[in-house]
């Protein structure tokens, strides 16, 4: 696969989960899909509007008291802990609503999963609301970022102005 990043943005993504024999894939031209085992591929979309209470995915290893208080500002929610790229895929599949990432990641950790979630109608943005982008700085480290499906919710409000740019 050539040219997975165009204009500093992923345009295609593939995430495979060997333990469950599940593959998530998507592109801007063809939307997002999930393939489980030998089943036929199924089209997936982010959930809009977000569920109530919202399902927020995160990592236990990156939890801290400040994050807890920020999440409380979002209102009633269920926090589910899981592995890295799976968080993006749960959003792409419409099984989660928000993923705040305030810990270190590298571009290779996120580009494929971002391609899937954006193909499913989701957004991956930095603290200022601009899209997470690639290959345009000296470091391969990502700034803090947020993944969500429902753009009507004010997901970023509790995190803005708190120096969450890494």
Predicted segments — roles?
Residues 93-98, 122-123:
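Alpha-to-beta junction loops
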Residues 2-89, 138-166:
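Acidic beta-strand-loop-alpha-helix segment within the catalytic core
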Residues 60, 103-105, 127-130:
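Short secondary-structure boundary segments
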Residues 122-137:
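Acidic, metal-binding active-site segment of PIN/NYN-like and related structure-specific nucleases
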Residues 84, 102-103:
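Beta->alpha turn/N-cap motifs
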Residues 56, 90-92, 111-118:
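Hydrophobic residues within well-ordered alpha-helices
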Residues 108:
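Acidic donor-binding loop at a coil-to-helix junction in glycosyltransferase catalytic cores
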Residues 76, 101-102:
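A generic structural signal for short
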């Amino acid at each position: 696969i050539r040219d997975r990043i165009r204009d500093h943005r992923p345009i295609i993504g593939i995430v495979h989960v060997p333990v469950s024999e599940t593959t998530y894939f998507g592109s801007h031209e063809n939307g997002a899909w999930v393939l489980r085992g030998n089943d036929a591929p199924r089209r997936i979309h982010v959930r809009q509007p977000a569920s109530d209470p919202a399902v927020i995915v995160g990592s236990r290893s990156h939890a801290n008291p400040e994050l807890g208080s920020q999440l409380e500002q979002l209102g009633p929610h269920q926090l589910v802990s899981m592995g890295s790229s799976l968080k993006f895929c749960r959003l792409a599949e419409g099984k989660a609503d928000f993923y705040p990432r305030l810990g270190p990641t590298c571009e290779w950790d996120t580009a494929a999963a971002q391609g899937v979630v954006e193909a499913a109608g989701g957004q991956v943005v930095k603290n200022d609301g601009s899209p997470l982008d690639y290959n345009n700085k000296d470091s391969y480290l990502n700034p803090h970022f947020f993944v969500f499906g429902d753009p009507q919710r004010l997901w970023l409000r509790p995190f803005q102005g708190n120096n969450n740019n890494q």
